[in-house]
Amino acid sequence: MKLRPLHDRVVIRRSEEESKTAGGIVLPGSAAEKPNRGEVVAVGTGRILDNGEVRALAVKVGDKVVFGPYSGSNTVKVDGEDLLVMSENEILAVVEG
């Protein structure tokens, strides 16, 4: 199944983070914080402005992004994989390089 977000929404695959502390202690799944990085897998058509025009999104499929800890509260399961759906304005930065 393919997910196509609407308007200014973005679908993100959360990155897998290491579940070890700097000291080498392995954290159980419940103690580890969810990573706040991911890869954009789908983008909507753009944000609808007050004058009716559509502004294209600044992120594109394949971008590695950073988002806030409470961003992407909408999680959907597609083909057994949990994906986040969030508005573009919830993305804090694009990781380059």
Curated annotation (Swiss-Prot):
Signal sequence interval, chain numbering: none
GO biological process annotation, one example: chaperone cofactor-dependent protein refolding
SMART domains xrefs: Cpn10
Pfam families: Cpn10 (PF00166)
Main location: cytoplasm
Keywords: Chaperone, Cytoplasm
Cell compartments where the protein resides: Cytoplasm
Assembly behavior: Heptamer of 7 subunits arranged in a ring. Interacts with the chaperonin GroEL.
Similarity-based family: Belongs to the GroES chaperonin family.
Designated name of the protein: Co-chaperonin GroES
Organism: Pseudomonas putida (strain W619)
